Amino acid sequence: MSKPLVIVESPAKAKTIAGFLGSDFVVESSIGHIRDLPRNAADVPGALKGEPWARLGVDVENGFKPLYVVAREKRDQVNKLKALVRDASEVYLATDEDREGESIAWHLLEVLSPQVPVKRMVFHEITRGAIERAVADWRELDRRLVDAQEARRILDRLYGYEVSPVLWKKVMPRLSAGRVQSVATRMLVERERARMRFRSAEWWGLDATFGKDGATFGAVLAAVDGRRLADGKSFTEDGHLRPEAAGVVVLDEAGASGLAARLSQSDFVVRSVEEKPYTDRPKPPFMTSTLQQAAGSKLRFTAQRTMQTAQRLYENGHITYMRTDSTTLSQTALAAAREQAVQLYGPDSVPSSPRTYQRKVKNAQEAHEAIRPAGDTFRHPREVARQVGPDEARLYDLIWRRTVASQMKDATGLTVTIRLGGTSSTGEDAEFSSGGTVITFTGFRRAYEEGADHVEAPTGGNGADGDQERRLPPLAEGDDVEALGFEAEAHATKPPARFTEASLVKALEEMGVGRPSTYASILGTIQSRGYVWKKGTALVPSFVAFAVVGLLERHFGELVDYGFTASMEDDLDAIATGNEEAVPWLTRFYFGNGTPGLRPMVSDHLGEIDAREINSIPLGTDDQDRLTVVRVGRYGPYVQRGDDRASVPEDMAPDELTLARAAELLEAPSDDRALGTDPGSGLTVLVRTGRYGPYVQLGEEETGDGAAAAGGKGRGNGSKQAAKPARVSLLKSMTPANVTLEDALRLLTLPRSLGSDPSTGEEVMALLGRYGPYVKKGSDSRSLGSEEQLFDITLEEALVIFAEPKRWQGRGGSAAPGRELGEDPAT
């Protein structure tokens, strides 16, 4: 007997939903997208390989018609779904209710071609009630959402496939450009440029301790002789006093210490007491971006880790759909949150009517609720923690507290600001300021403070981030207070903080660039492409990012313009609502209409781009008028002054590479030396030190545009063809000072072929990687016990190692090489 077939994206979701629907339904997953634009030339059907548009996968001359292909790895699953469709009484397409989910549903419909009724089934949480309602309240496929997603996909393909090759030719291979990733990279580079321009300004202040009726409290110097004391806002980014701050007092160490001494015997009186009501309002429930921000700052989760954890919570029925830019709660959720607050914190914890929140996100468009605990009643974090892993438990706790707190009353209290004054022994009038806050009603803060392993700092309306309760003794205007001590305190302006994953997501969201579902993947891409690396939680742009952003700003400025990129999101929204047609819009973007389109922009500018100029970042000139630049080389960044070069240390951030630091690198003694001549080739054998440590090299490399020595100082010969010489890292037992020609020639035999596996024909190699010695056969790698084995292990011994079960060592053991991450820079 035929049964209804429900198709979802993931096996985990299919398993959960099948449990709710029972044996009357068949539930299967598509395992994500089943087809897409071709990833490479091999995916393009033979009959179309000769077409001029084949590399794009989009026929730009024929209405931007996309070429869709079923991925090889999805063909078995597609065949399985086709068989299930043939036996089904009806088909429910139950993919996520957003543009991407609607697109997946449409592709399923196109590929499977069901001959039975097809229904679009949507839900925002995976609970029994939600799934049963979704089966009953199905709808038709929304073709406008499909068109909008298709336009977005085509746009990103055109952008990436047209601009990325420019980067390969002018900067280095394997780079990529993208509508959102290039803007994100520009933001990181601009912030680093600001840090490089920054010059710190120093000033001194005075901290005081006062006493009254046995109670003590602190205060800071606010004014001298009626003139305000300087603070961080008084200075520009280059360390100068702002014009509007011309009248402020700027103390140095001697001035602050001297004033402290002159005030040590002074009498002080309370000059004013100002009281203001204090209100701290709860934040809205989470949407995707704010969840990523909170999980990043409170749990130290990356955006990707947050989304993967949220996905598992969603698929197992613990939270609602996690890709949304809505802060709205359904009536059911409002009731559940209020009920939970009343149960845990009493009837006085909630306001008389539910709280609603207005979305402030530019281009907000997702149709879902905010992210909240699933169900008509919320399960307490302790209950959920017994059923999920540690990451899931911590993230659920964060979501639960934020949701419940959003429906509780404000925290209220009183903020008191006191001004105290006295006269120094030389007649100077010194005024100090002290403030305190007393919380009289904790309100929503109870949801964060009670029983939490981590506390999200409550912030809101009138409260500053991280407001802490600070009590002052009862004081009135005219009261005498005792000065118990003074301490001069140094202060300095700080450069603008680098972005973290959380703050970058927030900035992109505020500008209307990207979508909730894209932020995690964008952050992953800019890191995997080498545009950024992490220093703690801070995102540090590489010099490669500087070169790429410089090229795009100079020659493709519109493509990384924040306003233009956000306007594209507006246009895609208009396509989704039917107010814009995809093909005319893509035509304007690609071919132009009054302004240059993408294709002419690339073809017209490519010849103008000077690769050497793009890959050079000036640091300045020294006292001998010699220009020092950072160059992006094939083997890493290096500094150059005249003919002298030196590698930039791998862990050096751009703002740390000052002109003085570059001079130190250039003038440092070099470990480079010639060891002798290779008898076989006649080439010089050298030992050098590069960004990944010391290595031996056979012959001098040729350098051209964008190529440079991997380490130490050297001279280029101006050749346009860059040849990469053989290089091998030194063994742990070797140093540049003690390595001999014999050692080097032995190292240069690596990687060493041991022969082929008789059973599979695969070549077996002995290699030295960044993480130690190992043998490799096909995609299988095994660590070796010692570096000496590299030179004497036989094929038979290697095959014995491969025949044993792979053992992953714990602490103190030899770590298995794991998956391949790429070529070792030396070998």
Segment roles from a protein language model:
Residues 11-14, 31-37, 97-101, 124-130, ...:
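Conserved nucleotide-binding/hydrolysis micro-motifs of P-loop NTPases
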Residues 29, 69, 165, 190-191, ...:
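Accessory interaction regions appended to the cores of large information-processing enzymes
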Residues 96, 292-294, 298-302, 306:
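A conserved hydrophobic secondary-structure block that centers on an alpha-helix together
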